[in-house]
Each structure stands twice: as C-alpha cells, then as structure tokens.
C-alpha cells in the first residue's frame, strides 16, 4: 500500500503511508505494517506462498489423521475395528447397518482442496512479470477458501467425530492377549531366533504365544504372562529377567 505502480510511490501524497497504515491497523484490529521495501513487495507475492505452504502442511497432517480414523474404525467385521466413530448418517441405502466415516471423509475433502489451492497459488505467484502480478485475485480467493474450509474442517472433526470416539475395548483386549507380535518384547530375554520360533509356531497352530513358548520349553506360561503386561509393553525400555 502506497507503492503505487512499481513501488516507488510516485503520485502518492507525501505522508500517505504513515497516515493510512495506522488507521488500517486500528479499523481491522490487525497489526498492519508498511512494507520495508516497496519495490520488492510490489515485485514479489511470495508471502502468499508462505502462508499457503503452512496451510498445506496443516492439511496434509489433518488428512493423515482422518485416514487413520477411517482405518481404525473400519469394520465392524472385515476391518480393523479398534474404535467406533459416532454415526452421523443413516449409512448405506443398500447395506443395512453400515455406518460410513463421513466426517473424516469430508475433512479429507477440505484438505485436498487446500493442497490443490496451494498448487494454484504457487503457479499464480510464479506467473507474475516484473512488478505486474495480475493473478493476485486468484491468490487471495484460493487462500481465503483454504483458511475458511480448513478452520471449518477442524471444528467439525472435533465436535462431530473426535469427541464421540469410543474404544472397542472387548476387541482390543482380545487382540492384546492373542497378538503374536508381543514376542517382539521378548527379544532381549530369549533372543531373536527363539522369539521368531514362538511366533511362527503360534501362527501355524493358532495357539496363544504363552502356550507355545511353554510347549517349546522356552519359557513357562506363567512367567510369560507376568512379563507381557500392557503397562510394561507401552513404556520405554526393554524387558529384563527378574
């Protein structure tokens, strides 16, 4: 503001910038400041890229969270099913009882839009010539949409999804007790080869790893069950022989 055509300030009244900038800050409630270099600011619209890049990073993370929620809630019988998302629609018109993860899906849609807007803003910034940046309307519009839609996506994800998530405790407990991957924690105690032997036998027979370890004479069932406690397995460090 105040640089006029190419940043020199030609034809702008003397003192114009010093008068207008504080007034804009007062009216908007935003700490607006004048550009330190008017010519550089007129040539370069890189600030749009900076802000849009931050929004793209937020969008990629937000969509990743939504993807995780969709995967963890998949089911109820043919998916992961670790968690239950609140039902926000009646579900499928041809599959009774099916509940779709519509909130994570709509959040991902907003994220895809913001990522696409970032590409459009980048191209619009790059397409400027000297002090002429004819595509600033696109930059402003795309950035405005990204800000609005990502903010709305965050709110709806919190209110309509995250706050209503329930853990499928029965299924999770069963998986913890039956998981073959628990032998990973035994590596420091019995070594990789014996742990792998237990895992392969458990997969082949369908037996719990504690039972298999006892059958193979590697460790008693009672000792293994005492070692493979959830609180211990979810803390830093390695299992040690008592």
Where is each model-derived feature located?
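Conserved, well-structured ligand/cofactor-binding cores
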Residues: 1-242
